From Swiss-Prot:
HAMAP family: INFV_NCAP (MF_04070). A motif (Bipartite nuclear localization signal) lies at residues 198-216. SUPFAM superfamilies: flu NP-like (SSF161003). This is Nucleoprotein. Encapsidates the negative strand viral RNA, protecting it from nucleases. The encapsidated genomic RNA is termed the ribonucleoprotein (RNP) and serves as template for transcription and replication. The RNP needs to be localized in the host nucleus to start an infectious cycle, but is too large to diffuse through the nuclear pore complex. NP comprises at least 2 nuclear localization signals that are responsible for the active RNP import into the nucleus through cellular importin alpha/beta pathway. A motif (Unconventional nuclear localization signal) lies at residues 1-18. Belongs to the influenza viruses nucleoprotein family. GO terms for biological process: symbiont entry into host cell; viral penetration into host nucleus. It comes from the Viruses. Its main location: virion. GO terms for molecular function: RNA binding; structural molecule activity. Keywords: Capsid protein, Helical capsid protein, Host nucleus, Host-virus interaction, Ribonucleoprotein, RNA-binding, Viral nucleoprotein, Viral penetration into host nucleus, Virion, Virus entry into host cell. One of its GO terms (cellular component) is viral nucleocapsid.
Length: 498
């Protein structure tokens, strides 16, 4: 992208830092994940978890959620002002699973938020370490992206469920900052904006008064974030129109839905980061690894290397396939829910199956599920190769517009074609090119029509052996061009429910 020079790298966003050189970035990202690891170890000590229990991904998720809840200022304030919510505003907790007499038992724990905040700060040199919190949010978001479908949310905002590949980060909380904004897909931003506009249509005072001014600033900021994800002048110009509208209404919703559809071929730049469960960082810190000294990157070999050497367990329900559970978590760890399955399978070294064929439900266990029949298994999170994560949509010819597939937002910077059914996508663009954005719409449709599915994206980029940490010998895979690589094909996953 042309503006790359003015942007902070997403590791800098992640660590809240100003412009730094590569070594400083690696050190500050290392400090961030090291802090998560130290916090996790301390929590395991507090809860008296055995080594095995501490490696259980369900326990990791509970501990992560506790610290996120302890630092959720807005919700804490809300709970204090609305005591009828039936929750103690000062406490947080969740299910912890322990091994007793050859069986898994669930124990509900409750902690003072103040205590959790103290442990977190202590693990992070006395700082609030917001970057580490955001990192955990992104890991949860990536897990949701791989596990649940958002058909209902898409339909509610007037979008097409086939646009699911644009929905990365749709469950990220609002407070996830710049690092969170970087990983949100085009569809996620569009959906947030549409919800806002709809509120404005239904509530006369939404844009008025002191509050309305703040709302307006938030609206324009979200528009700018979305504009920054688009890579063609016409799409950006349309975003300017949406942002500058005096009184956003149905015309803007139309424009946004048009833009979301166009992103299926003229893809936006969306960042991808490998965010791992807290227990993985905990294991490394416990074994004496010094993240800050060694440095760490979320987009290079480091997460792959960490997963090669970590043993993480998961609870498995009676009729679930452990290999499928592993696939789900592997995809979440590498933010690969929207990646082409041909590419993911090649990197992982085992075939990755579409979600409709998975015999596994989500990782988290509901409180009403019977623990007597639960088993646990090792998650297979290793990979055959590693590849650099991308933040571009994989558009060819000078990062302009090119082919896209109705269900892919590339994660790995690896050469491939992006197969797509142009007819399916173009069918959505019949007719409406009149109105104030007509010339831009016409231009966008023209670019989409000239896109060729056989064009190669990420020309010359390959995967690397795990021994090749300096990325010197790219191995460029060749893929079967005809094999469509959508994870959401024949989808039957459950909906995401808050």
């Amino acid at each position: 992208m042309a503006s790359q020079g003015t942007k902070r790298s997403y590791e800098q966003m992640e660590t809240g830092g100003e412009r730094q050189n590569a070594t400083e970035i690696r050190a500050s990202v290392g400090r961030m994940v090291g802090g998560i690891g130290r916090f996790y170890i301390q929590m395991c000590t507090e809860l008296k978890l055995s080594d095995y229990e501490g490696r259980l991904i369900q326990n990791s998720i509970t501990i992560e959620r506790m610290v996120l809840s302890a630092f959720d200022e807005r919700r804490n304030k809300y709970l204090e002002e609305h005591p009828n919510a039936g929750k103690d505003p000062k406490k947080t907790g969740g299910p912890i699973y322990r091994r007793r007499d050859g069986k898994w038992v669930r124990e509900l724990i409750l902690y003072d938020k103040e205590e959790i905040r103290r442990i977190w700060r202590q693990a992070n040199n006395g700082e609030d370490a917001t970057a580490g919190l955001t990192h955990l949010m992104i890991w949860h978001s990536n897990l949701n992206d791989a596990t649940y479908q958002r058909t209902r949310a898409l339909v509610r905002t007037g979008m097409d469920p086939r646009m699911c590949s644009l929905m990365q980060g749709s469950t990220l909380p609002r407070r996830s900052g710049a690092a969170g904004a970087a990983v949100k897909g085009v569809g996620t931003m569009v959906m947030e904006l549409i919800r806002m506009i709809k509120r404005g249509i239904n509530d006369r005072n939404f844009w008025r008064g002191e509050n309305g001014r703040r709302t307006r600033i938030a609206y324009e900021r979200m528009c700018n974030i979305l504009k920054g994800k688009f890579q063609t002048a016409a799409q950006r110009a349309m975003m300017d129109q949406v942002r500058e509208s005096r009184n956003p209404g149905n015309a803007e919703i139309e424009d946004l839905i048009f833009l979301a559809r166009s992103a299926l071929i003229l893809r936006g730049s969306v960042a991808h980061k490998s965010c791992l469960p807290a227990c993985v960082y905990g294991l490394a810190v416990a074994s004496g690894y010094d993240f800050e000294r060694e440095g760490y990157s979320l987009v290079g070999i480091d997460p792959f290397r960490l997963l090669q050497n970590s043993q993480v367990f998961s609870l498995i329900r009676p009729n679930e396939n452990p290999a499928h559970k592993s696939q789900l978590v592997w995809m979440a760890c590498h933010s690969a829910a929207f990646e082409d399955l041909r590419v993911s399978s090649f990197i992982r070294g085992t075939r990755i199956v579409p979600r409709g064929q998975l015999s596994t439900r989500g990782v988290q266990i509901a409180s009403n599920e019977n623990m007597d029949t639960m088993d646990s298994n090792t998650l297979e999170l290793r990979s055959r190769y590693w590849a650099i994560r991308t933040r571009s949509g994989g558009n060819t010819n000078q990062q302009r517009a090119s082919a896209g597939q109705i269900s892919v937002q590339p994660t790995f910077s690896v050469q491939r074609n992006l197969p797509f059914e142009r007819a399916t996508i173009m069918a959505a663009f019949t007719g409406n090119t009149e109105g104030r954005t007509s010339d831009m719409r016409t231009e966008i449709i023209r670019m989409m029509e000239s896109a060729r599915p056989e064009d190669v994206s990420f020309q010359g980029r390959g995967v690397f052996e795990l021994s090749d940490e300096k990325a010197t010998n790219p191995i460029v895979p060749s893929f079967d061009m005809s094999n469509e690589g959508s994870y959401f094909f024949g989808d039957n996953a459950e909906e995401f429910e808050n």
